[in-house]
A protein has these predicted regions:
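Membrane-embedded alpha-helical segments that form the functional core of polytopic membrane enzymes
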Residues: 27, 36-60, 123-136, 177-196
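Multi-pass membrane catalytic core of lipid/isoprenoid biosynthesis enzymes
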Residues: 75-114, 213-245, 285, 290
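Acidic (Asp/Glu-rich) catalytic motifs at the cytosolic membrane interface
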Residues: 52-76, 192-214
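Intramembrane alpha-helical segments
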Residues: 2, 78-174
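Functional transmembrane core segments of multi-pass inner-membrane proteins
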Residues: 155-202, 220-224
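Topogenic membrane-insertion module of multi-pass membrane proteins
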Residues: 1-41, 45, 143, 155
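Small-residue-rich segments of transmembrane alpha-helices in multi-pass membrane proteins
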Residues: 22-27, 153-168, 215-219, 280-294
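Extended hydrophobic alpha-helices typical of membrane-associated regions
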Residues: 242-301
Length: 301
């Protein structure tokens, strides 16, 4: 495999989106540590499984959009390997299958190590299979849910509630509904990353019949929705810190708020899709920074 081919596979994996996978796991692990039940092996396996699922979703996204003709050379975002002809559909499908198998194997090992009873084993096995199916069917299949505007809900669920909550539960074996606040906050920040992508590609998606939430809302309301995601996520972190942690260090995440506010103002003011191109990576890093500071604050508490 040539250096160019390797680079194309790396680009197709979209490393700039991987901080989202890391963010949900470190938050769930920090919440478990805050409850004094941290397990580094489970955390590591959760992290690896989630990263593989993110890569699987990215591969499936490119494959599905290519098959449906949604991604063309006119797209504003970076051109993927399949668009440039460096990777053909057959190769990408093979890569997709390999990553799907790796995700299932890693997730299976995680469940075997972490489960305490048959109910947990069955529940997390089902959730693992659903996660793989959801990653693939976002754009692949006869009725991909990404084309129906349901991508944001899926991201909130898998990169927020299940990502954070699952990591927490597998270590503590406890259902603690208070952690829904940081879990939802993490998911909303991840949804903001997807929304930037969809705002940027809104015209191309509309032409291709890809009715993302941004397409349904339109450019103006899509930007209002983006700001709402940022505001509500911040409120969720604040409410959790005030009610459940009650220490100054729990508010470490506010150190990242100036960057978050600057990002929101930029997205609101700049209407040109091309201007949003660097915002996806920026939002992804902001999400990681906020979750990292929130997690550090929990550990110091």
């Amino acid at each position: 495999m040539t250096k160019n081919a390797i680079k194309m596979w790396i680009d197709t994996a979209r490393p700039k989106t991987l901080p989202l996978a890391v963010a949900s796991i470190i938050t769930g692990a920090a919440l478990a540590a805050w409850s004094r039940q941290f397990n580094w092996i489970i955390t590591l396996l959760c992290l690896l499984t989630t990263i593989l699922l993110q890569i699987l979703s990215n591969f499936a996204n490119d494959y599905g959009d290519h098959q449906k003709g949604s991604d063309t050379v006119e797209r504003i975002g970076p051109l993927r390997g399949i668009q440039q002809g460096m990777i053909d559909a057959k190769q990408l499908r093979k890569g997709l299958i390999i990553v799907a198998i790796a995700s299932l194997c890693c997730g299976g090992l995680l469940i075997i190590i972490a489960y305490q009873n048959i109910a947990d084993l069955l529940a997390f096995t089902l959730l693992g299979v659903l996660a793989v199916v959801a990653a693939i069917t976002y754009t692949v299949g006869t009725k991909p849910y990404g084309y129906m505007g349901l991508g944001d809900l899926s991201v909130l669920l898998f990169f927020g509630i299940l990502g954070v909550g699952g990591t927490y539960y597998l270590q503590t074996q406890q259902l603690n509904f208070s952690i829904l606040l940081p879990a939802i906050a993490t998911g909303l920040l991840a949804s903001a990353v997807l929304n930037i992508n969809n705002l940027r590609d809104i015209e191309q998606d509309r032409k291709a019949g890809k009715n993302t939430l941004a397409v349904r809302l339109g450019p103006e309301n899509g930007r209002r929705y983006h700001c709402l995601l940022l505001i509500v996520s911040t409120l969720c972190y604040c409410i959790f810190a005030v009610i459940y942690v009650q220490t100054v260090t729990a508010f470490l995440f506010v150190l990242a708020l100036p960057w978050l506010i600057k990002h929101g103002v930029f997205v609101s003011k700049h209407k040109e899709p091309l201007a949003l191109r660097p915002m996806l990576a920026q939002m992804s890093l902001i999400a990681l920074l906020i979750n990292g500071l929130f997690s550090l604050g929990l550990l110091l508490s």
